[in-house]
């Protein structure tokens, strides 16, 4: 089976083209993704992207993504940029591209040089803040309430409680501003495996959640450290960056256009009246043929 390895800001994916036919059986996709993403034993990646025909005529193409633990995600910002580049360069010269995702419609606009996609601007939709959209269950809050810089108790020895905000941008995110928690990003990096994992699996989040630690540098710049649901630490997260900027702006910490610095590089996020836009690139690394999935 042929596949393509791609990355966006160091977030790496195995891309499988199923536009003209299924290559991995539906019931096997989760286990296949878990095995092939295992670094050192198989190809290794943060996730697997499947390109498929859309389920209705309102879309051009369908995006599906499975995390390295085999769980299927609703959306992925870095993944959809890789996806959009692949689709334009190898399947259809459609620009803008209307993409069907589990999180709803996403529209990719591409900056083209020759036949190559250099930059992708993705319409990320309108954020949802109600607890029922996360979902989140916490005492004292109703399902239509928002959770903005609210406090959760933790059980780890490093951070007994945390102030965080939640938002859904196609998938759910918890955004933690380090300055509001009297910690810094060095502390976060030292204890990320413990704190990030606990928040991801916290009982308040029955479907788990992505976790982002944010330092506001100035009204136009932030720095982010990410713990992704189903993947753990990653060098970048497009939807998480979008969520972080949305929350920073909503809480009055930044302007509506922000440059976000991540371990894998930079992303630009712009908040407009009709929704949120993410701007960044993607890289096609190599094509290969899978001989053995590994174990």
Swiss-Prot record:
Catalyzes the stereoinversion of LL-2,6-diaminopimelate (L,L-DAP) to meso-diaminopimelate (meso-DAP), a precursor of L-lysine. GO terms for molecular function: diaminopimelate epimerase activity. The active site is at residues 76, 237. GO terms for cellular component: cytosol. The gene is dapF. It is an enzyme of class 5 (isomerase). Its main location: cytoplasm. This is Diaminopimelate epimerase.
